[in-house]
Amino acid sequence: MVRRAEPPDGGWGWMVVLSAFFQSALVFGVLRSFGVFFVEFVAAFEEQAARVSWIASIGIAVQQFGSPIGSALSTKLGPRPVVMTGGILAALGMLLASFATSLTHLYLSIGLLSGSGWALTFTPTMACLSRYFSQRRSLAMGLALTGVGISSFAFAPLFQWLINNYAWRGALLLVSALSLHLMACGALLRPLSLTEDAAVGGPGAQITSLLRHGPFLRYTAALTLINTGFFIPYVHLVAHLQDLGWDPLPAAFLLSVAAVSDLVGRVASGWLGDAVPGPVARLLMLWTTLTGVSLALFPVAQASSTLVVLAVAYGFTSGALTPVAFSVLPELVGTGRIYCGMGLVQMIESIGGLLGAPLSGYLRDVTGNYTASFVVAGAFLLAGSGVLLTLPHFFSCISVSTSRPQDLVIEASDTKIPLPKEEGLGEN
């Protein structure tokens, strides 16, 4: 395979964008709409909210904690077979969940099996996309991740309609059929070889260098805090609205309102990330702060109009932070280490995904409402914003990628691994 000196910034990369669009829809669109099933599981198994919340949390955590496996396999085999295998596992998990007779079955089928499929699907696709773009990376990420917004808008009322007509078991069977389309997404991922790949060494050397890289560790800590509160509305907003007296279908529709705003936010932020001078991390900090504030204000709102405004605000800002979050990482670790870097980030931030929803459910069980749940979720995002302030060149007027001097080459396991001088190993 011929090595390219630079990412092509187009060409087949747009087909990778298309693949990532549908892949993100079929992974996080399903996860974000899972609050509709949450109410059904509580009623069907007569369990507390905290225990039912573990279904989505295990799925999110397994998807993220297993990401290094998907990354390592993609480094060896290429992303195509890995993603196609992930599609099979995701569909199989939903299929088995439709026959569940206890929460344990749902933990294993949706949480473990489908989560494993998502781990082999999401990270390799997004890492592959990062390698195809440089100057237009944020825009490409924004367009690809609009799949989450569009599917969240469509899936929440669709899933509620399916539940009303086929019960939750029949609805899960149809979600399984949808998940099989991840195989087609994987078939579109053509491997790309870059000259930087020859200099970064094997996966072991890459992981060792990343774990000693101060800016990478701080960025990972920030995303872990953000991830803890990020998914709370998509798990508990429907239940919160029903506590306020809303009917299930209008409550699910409010998730769709947030999803439309999310869609606009992803495209707008993707364009701004490439167009506005300065480090992309600064834009990420802005969107994260606004998302945290909107989350904390949800319990204050009582009127329907106010809740709609907050849903629009949360949808836009939470959608806007996603593409720039993926754009910051290649600036810190380089495209040659993007598979390992993205997999490692996803694994570590899975701690937040694992604890977020159960913590929210626990606070609901203790206090009797979701006020503390949303306030604490917002606080986690604001804490993540504070950590982002410590990244290199945050207060610079130029981007990280254009401010780097000549790379410093560091020996690790007899392999030369370049890292930027001002971001050297061991920096704290």
From Swiss-Prot:
Gene3D superfamilies: MFS general substrate transporter like domains (1.20.1250.20). One of its GO terms (molecular function) is symporter activity. It is a multi-pass membrane protein. One of its GO terms (cellular component) is cytosol. Pfam families: MFS_1. The chain crosses the membrane at residues 11-31, 52-72, 81-101, 106-126, 139-159, 172-192, 221-241, 244-264, 283-303, 306-326, 338-358, 374-394. Keywords: Cell membrane, Golgi apparatus, Membrane, Symport, Transmembrane, Transmembrane helix, Transport. It is found in: Golgi apparatus membrane; Cell membrane. Residues 1-10, 395-428 are cytoplasmic. It comes from the Eukaryota. InterPro entries: MFS, MFS_dom, MFS_MCT_13, MFS_trans_sf, Proton-linked_MCT. Proton-linked monocarboxylate transporter. May catalyze the transport of monocarboxylates across the plasma membrane. Belongs to the major facilitator superfamily. Monocarboxylate porter (TC 2.A.1.13) family. PANTHER family: MONOCARBOXYLATE TRANSPORTER (PTHR11360), MONOCARBOXYLATE TRANSPORTER 13 (PTHR11360:SF19). This is Monocarboxylate transporter 13. It comes from Mus musculus (Mouse).
